[in-house]
């Protein structure tokens, strides 16, 4: 395995930084970490200083699979829910990539620039609406557990500075106080 000999670290948010709470070396493509948790929390698996994937620390046996094509976490209810969402988002990301390729093909095929612009813009807007709906619905369905705030923070961290997009405003406006008062969301 290309990961053999690498150290993996589990880190959780602590104030404004990520705190390492466990680590393991990958041997023959496998690693194992065990522990007892008194609460459910979002975490990230790191290789060196690079976050490679989010997951939920919760009671149960968590299985993490990393290969060249994808990363999947299963075995517990919230991780199953999170990676179902990740799979749907990846599918939309793939469609967005394919849309860019389609635009290039249309140019190469000699289609009229205004026709290309119209068609590609329509498809981009449709895809953006699907992505926003997916994120909003997922966060709303998970207001009451760590996934709602966790994915909300990931959505916000896509921007180089704090910004209130219409999507972020909608999520906040419709959220219960418990979500709004979460320390991660308040920041």
Each language-model region and where it sits:
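A non-transmembrane, solvent-exposed segment enriched in polar/low-complexity residues
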Residues: 1-133
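A short, acidic, amphipathic alpha-helical segment used as a generic capping/interface helix at domain edges
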Residues: 133-139
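Charged, long alpha-helical assembly modules
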Residues: 140-143, 147-187
